[in-house]
């Protein structure tokens, strides 16, 4: 597999961990996250995507591996332009929302400042 994206978490909003616990999802946003969303986001340092995100690819968060099960229609565009995607740990095979990346997870990710997020296709 080829690495197509890597970012580090710069800041964790006060409600971000609660989104994982309560909604089984996390929100990534580049440094320009709108203030009203920032409290729910993991701010990341990179928006450079060098390939296509595909079903069957892999998401790695601090070496925790999650198979990609569905890719929303605007995931790549939002990641490139805003550093923004929602990652849902529900294993859905059909994208529920255009900006959501779905992954299979026995348990949701645990991440914090300095965590490394990678995508492979």
Give, region by region, the residue ranges found by the protein language model:
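N-terminal disorder-to-order initiation segments that are Gly/Lys/Arg-biased
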Residues: 1-40, 115-116, 121
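Helix-rich interaction surfaces within compact, conserved domain-sized segments
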Residues: 17, 28, 91-121
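Short, structured beta-strand/loop micro-motifs enriched in basic residues and often containing a Trp
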Residues: 37-48, 93-103
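Short, conserved secondary-structure segments in the cores of folded domains
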Residues: 49, 55, 75, 105-107
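Short, well-ordered loop/turn sites that connect or cap secondary structure elements
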Residues: 51-54, 59-60, 111
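Conserved "cap/hinge" positions at secondary-structure junctions
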Residues: 62-63, 121
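Short, conserved beta-turn/loop elements at beta-strand boundaries and strand-helix junctions
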Residues: 64-65, 71-77
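Short, solvent-exposed secondary-structure boundary/capping segments
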Residues: 75-86
């Amino acid at each position: 597999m080829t690495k197509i994206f890597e970012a580090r978490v710069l800041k964790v909003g006060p409600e971000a961990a609660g989104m994982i616990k309560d909604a089984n999802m996390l929100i990534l946003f580049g440094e320009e996250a709108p203030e009203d969303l920032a409290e729910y986001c993991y701010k990341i340092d990179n928006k450079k995507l060098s390939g296509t995100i595909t079903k069957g690819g892999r998401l790695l968060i601090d070496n925790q591996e999650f198979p990609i099960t569905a890719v929303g229609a605007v995931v790549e565009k939002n990641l490139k332009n805003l550093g923004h995607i929602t990652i849902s740990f529900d294993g859905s095979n059909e994208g529920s929302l255009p900006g959501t990346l779905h992954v299979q997870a026995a348990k949701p990710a645990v991440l914090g400042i300095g965590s490394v997020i990678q995508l492979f296709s």
